[in-house]
UniProtKB/Swiss-Prot annotation:
Post-translational modification: During the catalytic reaction, a sulfide is transferred from Cys-233 to a reaction intermediate, generating a dehydroalanine residue.
Localization of this protein: Plastid, Chloroplast
Function of the molecule: Involved in biosynthesis of the thiamine precursor thiazole. Catalyzes the conversion of NAD and glycine to adenosine diphosphate 5-(2-hydroxyethyl)-4-methylthiazole-2-carboxylic acid (ADT), an adenylated thiazole intermediate. The reaction includes an iron-dependent sulfide transfer from a conserved cysteine residue of the protein to a thiazole intermediate. The enzyme can only undergo a single turnover, which suggests it is a suicide enzyme. May have additional roles in adaptation to various stress conditions and in DNA damage tolerance.
Organism, scientific name: Chlamydomonas reinhardtii
Keywords: Chloroplast, Iron, Metal-binding, NAD, Plastid, Thiamine biosynthesis, Transferase
Protein name: Thiamine thiazole synthase, chloroplastic
Enzyme class: transferase
Keyword Hydrolase set for record: no
Quaternary structure note: Homooctamer.
InterPro entries: FAD/NAD-bd_sf, Sti35, Thi4_fam
Spans through the membrane: none
Catalytic activity: [ADP-thiazole synthase]-L-cysteine + glycine + NAD(+) = [ADP-thiazole synthase]-dehydroalanine + ADP-5-ethyl-4-methylthiazole-2-carboxylate + nicotinamide + 3 H2O + 2 H(+)
Amino acid sequence: MAIKMNLASSKVGAKASAKSVRGARLVARVAQPMSPSSAATAAADASMLARAGLPPTTTPYDDYKFAPIREAEVNRAMTRRYFKDMDEFAESDVVIVGAGSAGLACAFELGRIAPHLKVALMEQSVAPGGGAWLGGQLFSAMVVRKPAHEMLDALQVPYEDEGHYVVVRHAALLTSTLMSHVLKNPNVKLFNATAVEDLIVKPDPALGPGGRRVAGVVTNWSLVAQAHGTQSCMDPNVIEAGVVVSACGHDGPFGATGVKRLARLGMVPGGEVPGMGALDMEAAEGSIVNNTREVVPGMVLTGMELAEVDGSPRMGPTFGAMIVSGMRAAHMAVAALERRRALSAAAAEGAAAEAQA
């Protein structure tokens, strides 16, 4: 009996499938002639305007023609420039991991105070900006507590002044403006859709016996990084850096990756990442800015990643601390570079003196 029922249901399913297939073909045949040609549309418009005693509509884009191009030219135009960037930024002064609000603010400030530095800005997503495209709970407006609004003035981003804070009409206005300023700097290269999979850590004699420093990042295209485990031999690439600024955000699938990796390497004081505390806007923003620092030699932490390592409160949907923490991180990065150069010079002088003795 069960077999007969299965056969019957199979026949019904086959009939329904045949009907749906036939219906799809019928719809496709009917749909094709329903789009009139542009010439027919233009003639109809001209006739209607003439009856109304109006001149024909013209636009600057009538009979628009593009310059000729070959597909191979497009290929070479993209490929040549991308690999030129990969070659030039294989050794960078600063690598910023994460192009959210803190990472972008850091890149912006580096361009202002040290435009000669070569800065590689890494972002695992196709679209940089992190969570700064919207305010809280997917709302449009962005709240920035004073005096962080001074950066908005510098960028000429309009806002509504509410006394102790300002409101940007749409968060995307600030983020897109900040991004455009960053990318105009010829010494900044954004590598989006590029994941940082690991850190380069090396011994540094200038730091004394057993001293280690972060010396760069291990990178891969994001889609390749997500496919690990499905294929073998998908080795990464590398970028050496004088200093790495980690702006990876709070914990999550792609969050706090820099400080979590340091913990696994035994380089975080206390040996673990406690995670951020409960939300307290009043306390959180000041804590984030004032604790922005070089956590280990060669690596500066900025933004909400600091809350993960310090156990400080989460901040919620206010963005002033992200902006100012990123800007402070830029100054910390420049100071770290200068300190490293001074230590290296002192170590070289000491080695030369010993050799002469």
